[in-house]
Swiss-Prot record:
Binding-site residues, Ca(2+) 1: 22-23, 34, 37-38
GO cellular component, as recorded: extracellular region
Full protein name: Glucan 1,4-alpha-maltotetraohydrolase
Name of a matching Pfam family: CBM_20
Residue positions of the active site: 214 (nucleophile), 240 (proton donor)
Organism for this UniProt entry: Roseateles saccharophilus
Catalytic activity: Hydrolysis of (1->4)-alpha-D-glucosidic linkages in amylaceous polysaccharides, to remove successive maltotetraose residues from the non-reducing chain ends
Top enzyme class: hydrolase
Keywords of this entry: Calcium, Carbohydrate metabolism, Disulfide bond, Glycosidase, Hydrolase, Metal-binding, Secreted, Signal
Coiled coil: none
Length: 551
């Protein structure tokens, strides 16, 4: 596919940007956001099974190093379970995408079981967490010759109980999927255990670093928390709660609540981040200035940190190929750059849609924004302030390394109008409709030239042979290298010459630094597999300097 070759070439010529430590752990409120430093790529679009039938896993394997080099720390994979469904309606047709699966066999329309394992291994080896899409609410119960057979009348299905309407009944604690005939009773011990065991299998056998839970309006959020606790408690998770206030019955408190309140309540109960449909609704129905009303713009950091922001996905947006995909709630083209500039410079965990990144020409722009986010140290819970008195949206975002001033569709003349200190321009696109400035006189990664500024130093660790779920990190005697703490070490993400691992890390200019290579588990920082033996590596930080170690 030509776009893959082009992406690889672009990644090779772009300058490397500072890597940040891959933080593990839950939020202060116990939410599984894996440290709050993820940038996620949605690794498919709706028509993948028609555009690249039985070959998508191979494509992901081939592009693993490019995905890592582009700055993504995780990839949202398609549903891995077998789906041979098909449908036609008014001249349109589809099926096989995974959302009407019939068993847990991995030989499906994205590729084979072996190809999936190879793709997961390549992605994990490149330092990209694999997050599987999972669909516990419903399955294709009528498909013949499936490996999961659940008879009617034993409480396995929603319609085994009286079903008075589209709300919980005695065999289902959520909404129906379409008419409800295919809805599973996830509260039944056998059904609960079936999914618990499969999530554990995906983690142990297929490199899962987390899960995206589909259609969570169909089952209790507490069930998601239990599944994660029982099978993958230290992993990342996110729920898709696409249900506005007016869709709840009049007697439900959520009928008069805000989008933010509804999705935050789900996150509180599931202990997982949640897709920021509060922001998506404002993107669709409000002005750019209204984007501040997303969950990621909430004044409370406990709200911001659970927001998983996105512009479009396989459901809401267009896809290459047949019928343009689903496009149920697609953002207008004229706002796509502004939207990515916002989610990639603001709090929350951003998700980039595959087709925006690799099919439709936004890739260079998105790479630039990822570099800005990483260099500034913007995280899920970073502070954000909005400034009135200007057109469009104007915000100040406080990263751990730099402050960003963001102006979208705005008449703001310069960052000094809303923030003190010196700033340099980082992004200016769409005829000035997208502008981002960062504090300091340079990029924080090698172009400052001033005493005490940060400069990019090239790190290399040789002979870093790892198992699935582990990566090579640099750790050392400065805060940028974790002060010798493995939990705060910096993951090296360039594995194009595996088992050599490389990365560019921002260090204080002129600082004498001592450091070592180590191998540790990505999800559990306490699982250190190997330290580099011998004396410490040494380097004096200077722009473009190189340093290496070896196992």
């Amino acid at each position: 596919m030509s776009h893959i070759l082009r992406a690889a070439v672009l990644a090779a010529v772009l300058l490397p940007f500072p890597a940040l430590a891959d933080q593990a752990g839950k939020s202060p409120a116990g939410v599984r956001y894996h440290g709050g430093d993820e940038i996620i790529l949605q690794g498919f679009h709706w028509n993948v099974v028609r555009e690249a039938p039985n070959d998508w896993y191979n494509i992901l394997r081939q592009q693993a190093s490019t995905i890592a080099a582009d700055g993504f720390s995780a990839i949202w994979m398609p549903v891995p379970w077998r789906d041979f469904s098909s449908w036609t309606d008014g001249g349109k047709s589809g099926g096989g995408e995974g959302y009407f699966w019939h068993d847990f066999n991995k030989n499906g329309r994205y590729g084979s079981d072996a190809q999936l394992r190879q793709a997961a291994g390549a992605l994990g080896g490149a330092g990209v967490k694999v997050l599987y899409d999972v669909v516990p609410n419903h399955m294709n119960r009528g498909y013949p010759d499936k490996e999961i057979n659940l008879p009617a009348g034993q409480g396995f299905w929603r319609n085994d109980c009286a079903d008075p309407g589209n709300y919980p009944n005695d065999c289902d604690d959520g909404d129906r999927f379409i008419g409800g005939e295919s809805d599973l009773n996830t509260g039944h011990p056998q059904i609960y255990g079936m999914f618990r065991d499969e999530l554990a299998n995906l983690r142990s056998g297929y490199g899962a670093g987390g899960f995206r839970f589909d259609f969570v309006r169909g089952y209790a959020p507490e069930r998601v928390d239990s599944w994660m606790s029982d099978s993958a408690d230290s992993s990342f998770c996110v729920g898709e709660l696409w249900k506005g206030p007016s869709e709840y019955p009049s007697w439900d408190w959520r009928n008069t609540a805000s989008w933010q309140q509804i999705i935050k309540d789900w996150s509180d109960r599931a202990k997982c981040p949640v897709f920021d449909f509060a922001l998506k609704e404002r993107m669709q129905n409000g002005s750019v200035a209204d984007w501040k009303h997303g969950l990621n713009g909430n004044p409370d950091p406990r709200w911001r940190e659970v927001a998983v922001t996105f512009v479009d996905n396989h459901d809401t947006g267009y896809s290459p190929g047949q019928n343009g995909g689903q496009h149920h709630w697609a953002l207008q083209d004229g706002l796509i750059r502004q939207a990515y500039a916002y989610i990639l410079t603001s709090p929350g965990t951003p998700v980039v849609y595959w087709s925006h990144m690799y099919d439709w020409g936004y890739g260079d722009f998105i790479r630039q924004l990822i570099q800005v986010r990483r260099t500034a140290g913007v995280r899920a819970d970073s502070a954000i302030s909005f400034h009135s008195g200007y057109s469009g949206l104007v915000a100040t975002v406080s990263g751990s390394q730099q402050t960003l001033v963001v102006a979208l569709n705005s008449d703001l003349a310069n960052p000094g109008q809303v923030a003190s200190g010196s700033f340099s321009e980082a992004v200016n696109a769409s005829n000035g409709q997208v502008r981002v400035w960062r504090s300091g006189s340079g990029d924080g990664g090698g172009n400052d030239g001033g005493e005490g500024g940060l400069v990019n130093v090239n790190f290399r660790c040789d002979n870093g042979v790892t198992q699935m779920g582990d990566s090579v990190y640099a750790v050392g005697n400065v805060s940028q290298l974790g002060n010798w703490s493995p939990a705060s070490a910096v993951r090296l993400t360039d594995t194009s010459s595996y088992p050599t691992w490389k990365g560019s890390i921002a260090l204080p200019d002129g600082q004498n630094v001592e450091w070592k290579c180590l191998i540790r588990n990505e999800a559990d920082a306490t699982l250190v597999r190997q330290w580099q033996s011998g004396g410490n590596n040494q380097v004096q930080a200077a722009a473009g300097a190189s340093t290496s170690g070896s196992f």
